[in-house]
Amino acid sequence: METRPSSSSSLSPATNLNLDRLKVLKLLGKGATGTVFLVHDSVSDSSVSSPFALKLVDKSSASSLRRARWEIQILRRLSDDTNPNPFLPKLLASSESSEFIAWALPYCSGGDLNVLRQRQNDGVFSSSVIKFYLAEIVCALDHLHTMGIAYRDLKPENILLQESGHVTLTDFDLSCSLNKPTRPEFYHLSDPEPDPNPESNLSHNKKSLRIFRQKKKKTKSARVNPITRRRLSFSGGERSNSFVGTDEYISPEVIRGDGHDFAVDWWALGVLTYEMMYGETPFKGRNKKETFRNVLVKEPEFAGKPSDLTDLIRRLLVKDPTKRFGFWRGAAEIKEHAFFKGVRWELLTEVLRPPFIPLRDDGDLTGKVTEESGFGIKEYFEKLKTPPLPLPHECSENNPFVDF
C-alpha cells in the first residue's frame, strides 16, 4: 500500500486536499489536460506564507483522467524515494471529487526555461549557463532512469526554476515505467573524439547559423508513417511503442515505430541543448510531416567553430539509439564528456551558484492577502461553464440577426 509523502508545507499529506478551502492567487498555466493555479489554504494558511501550485484536471475527459492518475502515481514514487533528487518535484497532497482530480506541488516562482531563454540577449544562453542547467537536468534524468522511469517529455516548458534558482522537471503524464536494460559496462562509440577547439562565441550563434543554412542544400525526402508500429525484440530490456512527445523533440525511433526506451530522453536532451545554444530546435519544419522527415534524415547544423558543446549535441543526436550517447552506460557517459569537465556532480546544489535567481513574486503575496482576496477553485470553473451574456444591439430593420 502506498503512503503519502511527508512535507514541510502547511498541507497535511495524510489527508486529501479540501478544494473548498483553497483560494486561487493566480492562474499559472492551462494546457490540454489540466489547469495549474497558485493557491493557498484559506484556513491553515490565511497569511499566505506557504502558497503552492495546484494542478487540477476535469474528470469529464477519460484520457485526461487516466493521465492525471498516472502522473500522481509517478509523483508518489518520487516522493516516497528514500534518496529524493533535488531536481525532481515532491507531491504535497492530492484529492479527487466527482468532478475533479487535483494534486499539490511546491511552487516554482522562476517560471520555465523557455521564458528565461527568450529574455536573454539574442534569445540564447551562454556556454556556462547551459552547462549549469544541463548538469542538473542530467542528474534528474539519471535518477528517473535508475527508478525505471522514462520521462519522454523533456522540453524547456517542462523545466521549472525553483525559488533557489535550481531546476525542477514537471509534467509526468507522458512518462512510462520500463525495466532497465542490461548492457555492457563499457562500450566504445564510433563517434568522433571531442574537438579540442575552444568554444565559439555563443552570442553570435543565431546569426551564424542563419548564414550557414543559406548555403545548405535541401534535405532528401523520407517516408514518414508514424501510424505504423513494429515491436522489436531487445534482450535484457523493455521498450515502449506508444507515440508520445512534442513534435520537435520526438526521436527517430518513435517516429519509425520501432519501440523505444530511455534513449529517447537523451535524444531530447540533445534537442534541448541545441535550442539553448541557438534559440531554435534543429529539425523544425514547416509542418509536422517535414519536421518528422528532418528528424529521420537531416543532420543538425552547427555554426561557428566546433567545440565540446557541439560535440556533445552531435553525440546525443545520433539517429541510431544503440549508438547514441547515454544508451549503454546511461548518464555516466554524459557526465564524463569534456563539456562537463570540472563539474562536481555530487555537490551541484552546494557548490555552483545558479546563474539566475528569481525575483520575488510580482504581488509579494506573503502577508498582503486579505480575507476577500482570491477566488475559489469551483467558482473559477463555474464561471467557465456559464455562457457569456449576449452583446447589446440596436433593433433595426437593417439588422437581420436581431431576435424579437
From Swiss-Prot:
Region (Disordered): 185-207
This protein's GO CC annotations: cytoplasm; nucleus; plasma membrane
Enzyme Commission number(s): 2.7.11.1
Enzyme class at the top of the EC tree: transferase
GO biological processes: integument development; negative regulation of cell division; protein trans-autophosphorylation
Effect caused by changing G165S: In ucn-1; loss of activity
Boundaries of every AGC-kinase C-terminal domain copy: 341-404
Knocked-out gene: effects: Ectopic growth in filaments and petals, distortion of integument planar growth and aberrant embryogenesis and partial lethality in ucn-1 embryos. The double mutants ucn-2 and ucnl-5 are embryonic lethal.
SUPFAM superfamilies cross-referenced by the UniProt entry: Protein kinase-like (PK-like)
Protein kinase domain: residues covered: 22-340
Reaction(s) catalysed by this chain's protein: L-seryl-[protein] + ATP = O-phospho-L-seryl-[protein] + ADP + H(+); L-threonyl-[protein] + ATP = O-phospho-L-threonyl-[protein] + ADP + H(+)
Keywords: ATP-binding, Cytoplasm, Kinase, Nucleotide-binding, Nucleus, Serine/threonine-protein kinase, Transferase
Active-site residues, Swiss-Prot/TrEMBL: D153
Subcellular location: Cytoplasm; Nucleus
Disulfide bonds: none
Binding site for ATP: L28, G29, K30, G31, A32, T33, G34, T35, V36, K55
GO molecular function, one term: kinase activity
Tissues expressing the protein: Expressed in the epidermis and cortex of the transition zone of the root apex and developing flowers. Expressed in rosette leaves, stems and siliques.
Function: Regulates planar ovule integument development by suppressing aberrantly oriented growth. Maintains planar growth of integuments by repressing the developmental regulator and transcription factor KAN4 which is involved in the control of early integument growth and polarity. Restricts growth in stamen filaments, petals, and cotyledons.
Similarity field: Belongs to the protein kinase superfamily. AGC Ser/Thr protein kinase family.
PANTHER family per the UniProt record, alphabetical: FLIPPASE KINASE 1-RELATED
UniProt name for this protein: Serine/threonine-protein kinase UCN
Organism in which the protein naturally occurs: Arabidopsis thaliana
Lineage: Eukaryota, Viridiplantae, Streptophyta, Embryophyta, Tracheophyta
